[in-house]
Amino acid sequence: MIALLLALPVLADDQVHLWILPEPEEFEVDRSILSVDEIHRANSFSRERDARRFSVCRSVLRDLLAGYVSVVANDLEFGKTATGKSSLTGLDEPWKKLSFNEAHCDGMVLFAFAQTEVGVDVERIQWLPDMGEIVTLYATQSEIRCLLELQRPSRASVFFRSWTMREVYAKRTGKGLAAFETAKEIAGIWSAAVRRISPFDRFDFQDEASVHRFFDCSPRSEYAVALCTATEVESFISFEVKRFVRTTEAAWR
Protein backbone atom coordinates (compact mmCIF):
# COMPACT_ATOMS: atom_id res chain seq x y z
CA MET A 1 0.00 0.00 0.00
CA ILE A 2 1.31 3.46 -0.92
CA ALA A 3 1.11 5.93 1.95
CA LEU A 4 -0.45 9.20 0.84
CA LEU A 5 -0.11 12.54 2.61
CA LEU A 6 -2.52 15.35 1.91
CA ALA A 7 -1.22 18.72 0.81
CA LEU A 8 -3.33 20.79 3.18
CA PRO A 9 -3.61 24.57 3.52
CA VAL A 10 -1.04 26.08 5.90
CA LEU A 11 -2.37 26.34 9.46
CA ALA A 12 -1.16 29.71 10.75
CA ASP A 13 -0.78 30.42 14.47
CA ASP A 14 -3.64 32.96 14.33
CA GLN A 15 -6.12 30.65 12.58
CA VAL A 16 -8.48 27.78 13.25
CA HIS A 17 -9.17 25.38 10.41
CA LEU A 18 -12.70 24.00 10.52
CA TRP A 19 -13.30 20.93 8.37
CA ILE A 20 -16.88 19.98 7.54
CA LEU A 21 -17.76 16.36 6.77
CA PRO A 22 -21.41 16.70 5.67
CA GLU A 23 -22.48 13.09 5.04
CA PRO A 24 -20.14 10.48 6.57
CA GLU A 25 -22.32 7.60 5.35
CA GLU A 26 -21.45 8.45 1.74
CA PHE A 27 -17.69 8.07 2.27
CA GLU A 28 -15.54 5.00 1.84
CA VAL A 29 -14.28 3.16 4.89
CA ASP A 30 -10.57 2.38 5.03
CA ARG A 31 -9.80 0.46 8.21
CA SER A 32 -6.22 -0.13 7.14
CA ILE A 33 -5.10 3.12 8.79
CA LEU A 34 -6.99 2.52 12.05
CA SER A 35 -5.33 1.23 15.19
CA VAL A 36 -6.26 -2.07 16.81
CA ASP A 37 -8.06 -0.13 19.54
CA GLU A 38 -10.04 1.90 16.99
CA ILE A 39 -11.09 -1.24 15.13
CA HIS A 40 -12.16 -2.79 18.43
CA ARG A 41 -14.23 0.32 19.25
CA ALA A 42 -15.86 0.19 15.81
CA ASN A 43 -16.74 -3.48 16.28
CA SER A 44 -18.30 -2.73 19.67
CA PHE A 45 -21.20 -0.78 18.12
CA SER A 46 -24.41 -2.77 17.93
CA ARG A 47 -25.55 -1.05 14.72
CA GLU A 48 -23.52 -1.37 11.54
CA ARG A 49 -24.33 2.22 10.58
CA ASP A 50 -22.78 3.53 13.80
CA ALA A 51 -19.70 1.35 13.36
CA ARG A 52 -19.26 2.59 9.81
CA ARG A 53 -19.69 6.23 10.80
CA PHE A 54 -17.10 5.86 13.56
CA SER A 55 -14.63 4.23 11.16
CA VAL A 56 -15.10 6.94 8.53
CA CYS A 57 -14.68 9.74 11.07
CA ARG A 58 -11.53 8.25 12.57
CA SER A 59 -10.07 7.65 9.11
CA VAL A 60 -10.77 11.21 8.00
CA LEU A 61 -9.37 12.59 11.27
CA ARG A 62 -6.20 10.54 10.86
CA ASP A 63 -5.74 11.69 7.27
CA LEU A 64 -6.27 15.35 8.12
CA LEU A 65 -3.84 15.15 11.04
CA ALA A 66 -1.32 13.32 8.85
CA GLY A 67 -1.57 16.08 6.27
CA TYR A 68 -0.83 18.76 8.86
CA VAL A 69 2.07 17.09 10.68
CA SER A 70 3.55 15.17 7.68
CA VAL A 71 3.36 11.79 9.39
CA VAL A 72 1.80 8.77 7.70
CA ALA A 73 -1.74 8.28 9.03
CA ASN A 74 -1.03 4.71 10.18
CA ASP A 75 1.87 5.92 12.33
CA LEU A 76 -0.01 8.57 14.30
CA GLU A 77 -0.18 7.84 18.02
CA PHE A 78 -2.90 9.30 20.22
CA GLY A 79 -2.76 10.13 23.89
CA LYS A 80 -4.58 12.25 26.45
CA THR A 81 -3.85 15.69 27.85
CA ALA A 82 -3.90 16.44 31.57
CA THR A 83 -7.59 17.33 31.23
CA GLY A 84 -8.47 14.17 29.32
CA LYS A 85 -8.63 15.58 25.79
CA SER A 86 -7.35 13.57 22.83
CA SER A 87 -3.93 14.61 21.56
CA LEU A 88 -1.08 13.40 19.37
CA THR A 89 2.10 12.13 20.99
CA GLY A 90 5.70 12.07 19.80
CA LEU A 91 5.50 15.18 17.62
CA ASP A 92 8.38 17.53 16.92
CA GLU A 93 8.21 21.30 16.58
CA PRO A 94 6.24 23.13 15.33
CA TRP A 95 3.44 20.60 15.84
CA LYS A 96 3.84 19.83 19.54
CA LYS A 97 1.11 22.33 20.38
CA LEU A 98 -1.32 21.22 17.65
CA SER A 99 -4.81 20.84 19.12
CA PHE A 100 -7.87 19.26 17.53
CA ASN A 101 -11.47 18.67 18.46
CA GLU A 102 -14.46 16.93 16.92
CA ALA A 103 -18.23 17.42 17.00
CA HIS A 104 -21.16 15.39 15.63
CA CYS A 105 -24.81 16.18 14.98
CA ASP A 106 -27.14 14.16 12.75
CA GLY A 107 -25.58 14.16 9.27
CA MET A 108 -22.75 16.59 10.00
CA VAL A 109 -19.30 16.06 11.50
CA LEU A 110 -16.84 18.87 12.25
CA PHE A 111 -13.10 18.76 12.91
CA ALA A 112 -11.30 21.82 14.29
CA PHE A 113 -7.50 22.27 14.23
CA ALA A 114 -5.42 25.02 15.83
CA GLN A 115 -1.97 25.70 17.26
CA THR A 116 -3.62 26.28 20.63
CA GLU A 117 -6.37 24.53 22.60
CA VAL A 118 -9.63 24.52 20.65
CA GLY A 119 -13.20 23.31 21.18
CA VAL A 120 -15.95 22.94 18.56
CA ASP A 121 -19.64 22.08 18.83
CA VAL A 122 -22.56 21.73 16.43
CA GLU A 123 -26.29 21.49 17.14
CA ARG A 124 -29.24 21.34 14.76
CA ILE A 125 -31.54 24.31 15.32
CA GLN A 126 -35.04 23.00 15.95
CA TRP A 127 -38.02 23.80 18.10
CA LEU A 128 -38.26 21.83 21.34
CA PRO A 129 -41.60 21.81 23.18
CA ASP A 130 -39.83 21.81 26.57
CA MET A 131 -37.28 24.46 25.61
CA GLY A 132 -38.52 26.86 28.29
CA GLU A 133 -38.11 24.24 31.01
CA ILE A 134 -34.63 23.27 29.83
CA VAL A 135 -33.46 26.88 29.85
CA THR A 136 -34.43 27.35 33.49
CA LEU A 137 -32.03 24.55 34.46
CA TYR A 138 -28.87 26.28 33.26
CA ALA A 139 -29.48 29.86 32.10
CA THR A 140 -29.26 33.16 33.91
CA GLN A 141 -32.41 35.14 34.61
CA SER A 142 -31.46 37.75 32.01
CA GLU A 143 -30.99 35.05 29.39
CA ILE A 144 -34.33 33.47 30.23
CA ARG A 145 -36.06 36.83 29.83
CA CYS A 146 -34.27 37.39 26.54
CA LEU A 147 -35.34 34.02 25.15
CA LEU A 148 -38.96 34.32 26.25
CA GLU A 149 -39.29 37.70 24.54
CA LEU A 150 -38.17 36.32 21.18
CA GLN A 151 -40.49 34.89 18.55
CA ARG A 152 -40.47 31.11 18.09
CA PRO A 153 -37.88 30.78 15.23
CA SER A 154 -35.49 33.29 16.82
CA ARG A 155 -35.91 31.67 20.23
CA ALA A 156 -34.77 28.28 18.91
CA SER A 157 -31.77 29.86 17.19
CA VAL A 158 -30.64 31.73 20.31
CA PHE A 159 -31.24 28.67 22.50
CA PHE A 160 -28.95 26.42 20.47
CA ARG A 161 -26.33 29.08 19.82
CA SER A 162 -26.05 29.81 23.52
CA TRP A 163 -25.83 26.06 24.19
CA THR A 164 -22.97 25.62 21.72
CA MET A 165 -21.12 28.46 23.46
CA ARG A 166 -21.30 26.52 26.71
CA GLU A 167 -20.20 23.31 25.05
CA VAL A 168 -17.14 24.72 23.29
CA TYR A 169 -15.94 26.37 26.49
CA ALA A 170 -16.26 23.07 28.33
CA LYS A 171 -14.49 21.22 25.52
CA ARG A 172 -11.62 23.68 25.20
CA THR A 173 -10.91 23.77 28.92
CA GLY A 174 -11.45 20.04 29.35
CA LYS A 175 -13.63 20.70 32.40
CA GLY A 176 -16.73 19.01 31.01
CA LEU A 177 -20.00 19.76 32.76
CA ALA A 178 -18.11 21.36 35.65
CA ALA A 179 -17.49 24.34 33.37
CA PHE A 180 -21.17 25.09 32.84
CA GLU A 181 -21.53 27.20 35.97
CA THR A 182 -18.92 29.64 34.67
CA ALA A 183 -20.35 29.28 31.17
CA LYS A 184 -23.60 30.89 32.34
CA GLU A 185 -21.83 34.22 32.01
CA ILE A 186 -20.66 33.36 28.51
CA ALA A 187 -24.13 32.56 27.27
CA GLY A 188 -25.47 35.73 28.86
CA ILE A 189 -23.04 37.82 26.83
CA TRP A 190 -23.94 35.95 23.66
CA SER A 191 -27.68 36.21 24.22
CA ALA A 192 -27.41 39.94 24.78
CA ALA A 193 -25.56 40.27 21.49
CA VAL A 194 -28.14 38.25 19.59
CA ARG A 195 -30.91 40.30 21.15
CA ARG A 196 -29.41 43.48 19.69
CA ILE A 197 -29.69 41.87 16.25
CA SER A 198 -26.26 43.15 15.24
CA PRO A 199 -23.29 41.35 13.65
CA PHE A 200 -21.50 39.50 16.41
CA ASP A 201 -19.24 36.80 15.05
CA ARG A 202 -16.83 36.64 17.98
CA PHE A 203 -16.24 37.80 21.56
CA ASP A 204 -13.71 37.28 24.36
CA PHE A 205 -14.40 36.01 27.86
CA GLN A 206 -12.03 35.86 30.83
CA ASP A 207 -12.38 33.22 33.52
CA GLU A 208 -10.13 32.63 36.52
CA ALA A 209 -7.40 31.05 34.39
CA SER A 210 -7.23 32.80 31.01
CA VAL A 211 -9.05 34.65 28.24
CA HIS A 212 -11.04 32.64 25.72
CA ARG A 213 -12.19 33.70 22.26
CA PHE A 214 -15.51 32.51 20.84
CA PHE A 215 -16.60 32.37 17.21
CA ASP A 216 -20.05 31.80 15.75
CA CYS A 217 -19.34 29.96 12.52
CA SER A 218 -22.50 28.16 11.41
CA PRO A 219 -21.92 26.65 7.94
CA ARG A 220 -25.65 26.22 7.31
CA SER A 221 -28.65 28.09 8.62
CA GLU A 222 -30.17 24.98 10.19
CA TYR A 223 -27.13 24.40 12.41
CA ALA A 224 -25.55 26.32 15.28
CA VAL A 225 -21.76 25.98 15.27
CA ALA A 226 -19.31 27.57 17.70
CA LEU A 227 -15.56 27.56 18.32
CA CYS A 228 -13.64 28.40 21.48
CA THR A 229 -9.91 29.09 21.35
CA ALA A 230 -7.20 31.54 22.44
CA THR A 231 -7.23 35.29 21.85
CA GLU A 232 -4.23 35.13 19.51
CA VAL A 233 -6.55 33.45 17.00
CA GLU A 234 -7.97 36.12 14.71
CA SER A 235 -10.07 34.05 12.32
CA PHE A 236 -11.27 30.65 11.24
CA ILE A 237 -11.30 29.14 7.76
CA SER A 238 -13.78 26.42 6.83
CA PHE A 239 -13.25 23.62 4.32
CA GLU A 240 -15.50 20.81 3.19
CA VAL A 241 -14.21 17.26 2.87
CA LYS A 242 -15.37 16.30 -0.61
CA ARG A 243 -14.53 12.61 -0.61
CA PHE A 244 -12.46 10.13 1.31
CA VAL A 245 -9.28 12.08 1.85
CA ARG A 246 -6.73 9.35 1.07
CA THR A 247 -7.45 9.55 -2.66
CA THR A 248 -4.94 11.34 -4.86
CA GLU A 249 -7.56 13.88 -5.93
CA ALA A 250 -8.20 17.17 -4.16
CA ALA A 251 -9.90 16.42 -0.86
CA TRP A 252 -10.92 19.93 0.10
CA ARG A 253 -12.34 23.11 -1.36
What are these regions (language model features)?
Residues 1-253:
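Core catalytic alpha/beta fold that binds nucleotide/phospho-ligands
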